């Protein structure tokens, strides 16, 4: 079945259609209907514009290409499974939640509270402007993500990020089993209370990073403006260049070309030791 060049505004306009192509349609109009594609299966959606709320709910097996979801298209994808979005624009708040097996490729996203409670989310070559993204999501792979947002990746588990630029704050709090390769992470208070965070060839920018962490590993990373780093953390870090200051690390080893100040004061945890090495040239 093919639905082409239609303007639809009814409630559940194409409810539960299966094995269909939806091409060049606009979901907008005075009826202001919600949930246009709810419960659809095996659909291909191409070149459509979504201006109404909740279009993709409980959808299974969809390919969505060159579509626009405007600012008024709130909560666009919830409770979905196995959807691939390519060259799409997502502009409404809470655009992705409680979904599984989602792929986003070359998408532009402006959405607060994006990507909550998702499982197996893959993003490649995407731009994301957001606040509070990826809360409690797991099993994610992100490559070439350009992100601007606050409070990102909190409580996430089993995440791999590559070649990305993350401009954020309070990122990776309470995260578990996250690895980041070849990326820039900018923002204060990075990864407090994280567990098994590994940063490889990354540049870290911002005050008071990586505190209260367990199993923290940094390999061949750079640190810029990172004062009061590693407080109460179990850390194994090899830093290229200097660290502005290190305060009361709990255990492990920190190796750098220079450290502006090492603060070991009366608040240091007793009966613990972290080896701090300044490499000579």
Region roles according to the model:
Residues 1-281:
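Long, distal/terminal scaffolding or interaction modules
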């Amino acid at each position: 079945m093919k639905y082409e060049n239609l303007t639809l505004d009814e409630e559940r306009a194409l409810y539960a259609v299966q094995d269909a192509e939806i091409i060049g349609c606009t979901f907008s109009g005075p009826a202001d209907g919600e949930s246009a594609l709810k419960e659809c299966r095996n659909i291909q959606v191409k070149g459509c514009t979504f201006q109404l709320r909740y279009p993709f709910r409980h959808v299974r097996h969809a390919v969505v290409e060159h579509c626009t979801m405007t600012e008024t298209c709130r909560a666009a994808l919830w409770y979905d499974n196995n959807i691939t979005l390519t060259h799409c624009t997502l502009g409404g708040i809470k655009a992705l939640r409680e979904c599984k097996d989602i792929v986003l490729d070359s998408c532009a996203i402006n959405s607060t509270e994006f990507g909550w409670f998702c499982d197996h989310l893959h993003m490649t070559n995407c731009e994301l402007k957001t606040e509070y993204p990826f809360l409690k999501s797991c099993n994610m792979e992100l490559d070439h993500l350009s992100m601007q947002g606050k409070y990102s990746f909190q409580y996430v588990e089993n995440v791999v990020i590559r070649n990305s630029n993350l401009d954020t704050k309070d990122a990776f709090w309470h995260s578990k089993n996250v690895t980041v390769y070849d990326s820039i992470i900018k923002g204060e208070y990075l990864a407090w209370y994280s567990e098994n965070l590994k940063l490889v060839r990354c540049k870290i920018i911002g005050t008071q990073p990586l505190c209260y962490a367990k199993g923290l590993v940094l390999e061949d990373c750079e640190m810029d403006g990172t004062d009061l780093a590693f407080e109460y953390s179990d850390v194994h870090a090899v830093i290229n260049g200097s660290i502005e200051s290190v305060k009361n690390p709990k255990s492990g080893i920190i190796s750098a070309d220079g450290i502006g100040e090492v603060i070991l004061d009366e608040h240091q945890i007793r009966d613990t030791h972290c080896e701090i090495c300044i490499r000579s040239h």
